[in-house]
């Protein structure tokens, strides 16, 4: 779903900066979290051992640990992830040092992503999967046009189907389009079913001063992803 100027202009603000980082940003592990996310199963260990260089091994382990935490892939700066690399070297490659680890080429990075998807039973969200997301967002919007509700339904579907989530901007456009389409659908049905005088009264009610009309007092965005708020 490529973004156009029209899409950008009607793109809804769904999550705060902190929420976006929590869901889609690179993990920032504590030492305890490193112990958990960089733990390797026998199959994972064998896969890491098959890498030809220390650079390839460390990057594969990094991305595997990050994917376990976020189900996302990241392009990393070595200096930015130095604490994670030091943990991996100390734990799995005693005697090796940070200066031995270089950057990966893009083809190798993409090849490692495919390896991780196979190891963990995930798939990229492409083609038919994205069409299914569009349909799901449209159905969800028929239940509620609150953007956070629709986004949560989409993210739950991706998790249940073990699909790598598209980027946040894509999901933002997806939800925004679903809300716009649902508003148009409901408006069209109302225009077809209601006399002109009732249409005018309804329009006035929905756009009146919030301080006067309870219907607008009750209309608000959910504060978070809890069931109570949604």
Where are these regions (language model features)?
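Long amphipathic alpha-helical coiled-coil/heptad-repeat bundle
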Residues: 2-230
